[in-house]
Structures are given as structure tokens and as C-alpha cells.
């Protein structure tokens, strides 16, 4: 695994964090914390790497290439079934921030997940959280996973072109892709999981998603580093909560706007309500994630009672944030 974080030249600590798609608004706090200088304030030199597929990001953590991942909490439960102890140390959102969009041309044929039968449904990659959630939505609405075709569609331009070229009829994605699709009228919203209300309607409860998760052994051995990361992330959540989408967009790298600042601001505005302010996991949210996964995830199915949820997240660090 990754050894101890190394000491930088100026006495700062080098930390590598992999983000499951750094330009996604659902993971905005990672790059924003960096841009605001909050990591440096904590004496951390954080290198932010990006890997658009969450399933691949978790592999780099297990392989020890990075110290932490900014990704979906559900991976911690999934990985526990494979004998890995991974824990969320900062829980940034109580909802997924995902949207199920349907191609405008197919909107009359797909009015709810019950209409998924025989359709091509996009997600980022197999084994990703969007794959999990798509399976759940189908199953919950009477469509077996064998009755639709799952398509690896990525995010951003790859997702949009899949929709354009009839590669998918509907799919799950996040802002800024959602804002782009609505702006060009290429897609309509079927289910909106950017809000608590929309998430409860779609998933029957909260579904805590965006988090900073790390290897349990690393967390035990480097509590000081984890505390500093928690300090920076929670401070960033506070910033998101107290600043406008315009102010937030202005702090981000220019290329994140993809040449359309107004649309980027809109995408932040449409999604920023998903973030909590304290980085704390809600226990009933964690329980609902397990509930959802245990219904169809091949890894979790039948093992629900063996999962120790207390090992999948901790509030130890966020409660001590100054």
C-alpha cells in the first residue's frame, strides 16, 4: 500500500487524492479546497488526480497508489464484502447528486423506471455507483436487470455523444453534463437525485454519496493527516454553503467551465444544495445505502447481516473540526 505521506520540502505533508471525475460538481469540494488554499493552510500539499470512473478510483486506493478517494460512499460497503476495510472520513452529501435523464426523442416512451424494459441505459462504467443505482431503480420498478441493456457511457462528452448517436435511450449523470443536455434540449429529467425530496422519491430514503474515503489502517496510523484533511474539506463545505454559484465558479480553474461560464454557474447552482455543511454521515442514510445495495448488488446480496456499517464511515474527525 501507499506508505506514510512523505514530508515535502517546506515541512508540508504530501498527500495524493484520486477524484472520481474532478470536473463533476458532485465532487467540486476537492478542487475547490485546493483552489481556496485550504489544504496548504493545514500544512498539506495535496495532489489531486482524476479518474472519471469511480470503480477505477477505488482500485487505485486498494493498490496503494493514492491515500484517499473522493467518490461515492457505497464503495466502502461493496469493498467490505471483498474483505477490504475502507472508511468515509468526510461525508459531503446526503444525496447522490445524480440525475436520470432521458433522450428528448424517447421521453414519451420512458415516463418512469418501469419503462426501462428493453431500453439501453447509460452509466459511467460497470461496477460504478451509477450502475448500482440504475439496477436498483429498475428492480424496484419491476424490471429485472436482464431486461435492459446497461451501457458504459462515461460522463461529459462521451455521455452526450452516446445519447446523440442512439447509443443510450436514457442514463444517469451529474452536473455539468445535466445542465449541458437541458440547455441543448437533448434530454429531459426523469429522476432528480440532487435534492433530498427527489432522492427519497427515487430511492426510498437518503443515499449519502460524495465522500472522502480512505483505507482504515491508514486512518488509524495517520490521524493527524486525516484531521487536517477533514478540517480543509469541512471548511470548504462551509464556503459552498455561504457563497453563490457565481462566486464558487470564479474560484475554479477556467477550463472547468468548458467555454460556457453561464452554463457552468447554472450547473453549480442546480447541484450545490446537495452538499451538507458539517461533513457528518447521517446514520439512517448509511443504513439506506446498505438496504439499496443488499437488494441487487451481487457482492452485498445475502450478506447484509455480515456488514459492519460502523467500519464504513467515521465522524471522529469531522466532529473535531475547529
PLM feature spans:
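Short, glycine-/small- and polar/acidic-enriched structural segments
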Residues: 3-153, 165-175, 186, 190-193
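Soluble non-cytosolic domains of exported or imported proteins
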Residues: 24, 51-55, 124, 128-129, ...
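Short, solvent-exposed loop/beta-turn-alpha elements that line the ligand-binding surface or hinge
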Residues: 41, 108, 112, 194-205, ...
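Flexible glycine/proline-enriched surface loops and loop-helix/loop-strand junctions
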Residues: 115-119, 164, 211, 232-235, ...
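Pocket-lining segment of extracytoplasmic ligand-binding domains
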Residues: 158-253
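Secondary-structure end/capping motifs
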Residues: 219-300
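Conserved C-terminal helix/tail region of periplasmic/extracytoplasmic solute-binding proteins
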Residues: 287-322
